[in-house]
Regions:
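Conserved N-terminal structural module of periplasmic/extracytoplasmic solute-binding proteins
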Residues: 3-121
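Short helices/loops that flank or line small-molecule/ion binding pockets
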Residues: 101-115, 166-167, 183-191, 275-291
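Hinge/lid segment of periplasmic solute-binding proteins
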Residues: 116-162
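A ligand-binding cleft/hinge motif common to bilobed small-molecule-binding domains
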Residues: 119-127, 292-309
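Periplasmic solute-binding protein
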Residues: 142-176, 200-234, 326-333
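Glycine-centered hinge/linker elements that transmit conformational signals in sensory
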Residues: 224-272
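Extracytoplasmic/periplasmic substrate-recognition and gating elements
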Residues: 303-364
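C-terminal capping/gating helix-and-loop segments adjacent to ligand/active sites or protein-protein/ligand interfaces
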Residues: 326, 355-419
Length: 419
């Protein structure tokens, strides 16, 4: 049976024309809409372009002024650093030396593009908001020294200096561990009046020596723990029994050891009252087996005296992975994204500039290939580069850079404890 044919409805000419007209109108509307959209997009692009252009122009104008701050540096150091920031056409340079009692972290962050100071409590307070140091700058120095927020320029060092004759007389090498240093001290008792000495009356030397002993006994973790405690406490009693590591390292254990040293003949009975002239007198008279000081202070000792002493890193009983060299670092920070400041920071890290800086200050350069002032400065760079923790600030800079009265009080309490 055949299917019936489907009936097709005929469309009249009039209807067809109406449909074609409607379709044409729809096409016209679509084209118009597209043109409108295109016009709007072009407008947006134009506005964005204008905004970007205005921003670029404003930034260029803003970057023309480079504001540089110095804090806690000697006049000579400030002048040395200024020389490496060139006066260029259309660039306005503003230099400020911030006085000891006028440092305000918030104000400094908002006002300046660059800051030069010693790494420590102050730089830590600004680190979170600081700009990254350009990678090309960091690549000039050993990996362990690369700090992208606070880049080291020169290194000082908390050192032990050994009387070479005492080393020879005892038949011992420079100690590699703190246990070996204790053996040296005991062996030196029959050779010199005071196997150990330091300028204990000077607050910075006193607190730095305590820090070196904590690093020697408990390592970097214990050292950092002590820094945290000293920053929030103002008395010796508050930190005396805080456990600094997983073992038995406390400030009390360190001070008890020092309290016994004079009784054991290891140091002068009043070492904690020693001053610069005392150390110099004993060293010149060949009465010291070793002494603790900063490299920068070592440089002030006359050559005819210091030539008889061999500088070394403070020996430790911890693994290399838990150790940082206590080496105060003259450092630079970028506090804004000023493009000219980012250019200028690179000027401090050429091989020639680093060699010049080391010669002028007698401190250690950080550039891998720069010539150091002498073997002592070269050793400091090598030791810092070889430590897992790199160069770390001394306790003075880490906890008391802006708290001299609190430091004076604490050191007075330490002297009372060990006497």
């Amino acid at each position: 049976m055949k299917n019936p044919k489907k009936k097709t409805k005929k469309i009249s000419k009039k209807t067809r024309k109406a449909m074609e007209a409607a379709a044409a109108r729809r096409v016209k509307i679509s084209k118009k809409t597209l043109l409108n959209i295109a016009a709007v997009l072009c407008g947006i692009v134009l506005v964005v372009g204008i905004c970007i252009g205005v921003h670029v122009i404003k930034k260029r104008r803003a970057d023309r002024t480079v504001k540089v701050a110095f804090y806690g540096l000697s006049e000579d150091m400030c002048a040395m650093l200024k020389e490496k920031i060139p006066q260029e056409e259309n660039i306005i340079l503003e230099f400020d030396v911030i006085s000891e009692n006028a440092f305000d972290a918030g104000l400094v962050k908002d006002k300046y593009d660059m800051l030069f100071t010693w790494r420590g409590q102050i730089t830590d307070s600004l680190q979170a908001s600081a700009e990254d140091i350009p990678q090309r700058v960091l690549e000039t120095m050993p990996t362990a020294l690369r700090n992208k927020k606070c880049v080291p320029i020169l290194l000082d060092h908390c050192e032990l200096a050994y009387y070479t004759k005492t080393l020879k007389d005892t038949g011992l090498e420079i100690p590699a561990t703190f246990k070996e240093y204790q053996a040296f001290l005991n062996a030196a008792k029959s050779k010199v009046f005071s196997p150990y000495f330091c300028n204990g009356a000077e607050d910075r030397i006193m607190i730095d020596f305590i820090g070196a002993l904590v690093m020697a006994q408990g390592g970097l973790k214990a050292y950092n723990k002590l820094i945290d405690e000293l920053r929030i406490n103002n008395s010796l009693d508050a930190v005396l029994d805080v456990k600094l590591d997983e073992k038995k390292c406390t400030l009390r254990s360190i001070l008890d050891m020092l309290k016994n040293w004079p009784k054991e003949g290891i140091t002068h009975p009043s070492w904690y009252n020693g001053r610069g002239n005392d150390l110099l007198f004993f060293a010149e008279d060949a009465q010291l087996g070793s002494f603790f000081t900063l490299l920068s202070e070592h440089r002030k000792i006359p050559y005819n005296v210091i030539k008889n002493y061999e500088s070394a890193m403070f020996p430790v009983n911890v693994s290399p992975a838990n150790y940082g060299l206590i080496a105060p670092a003259l450092s630079g920070m970028l506090l804004s994204d000023n493009s000219n400041a980012k250019r200028y920071i690179a000027n401090f890290f050429t091989e020639e500039t680093q060699t010049e800086f080391s010669d002028k200050t007698n401190l250690a350069p950080v550039h891998s290939r720069a010539q150091a002032y002498d073997r002592q400065a070269d050793d400091v760079r090598f030791w810092a580069a070889s430590c897992a923790g790199g160069a770390v600030p001394d306790l003075y800079l880490a906890a008391y850079q802006r708290r001299p009265e609190e430091l004076k009080k604490l050191c007075g309490e330490i002297r009372s404890y060990v006497r």
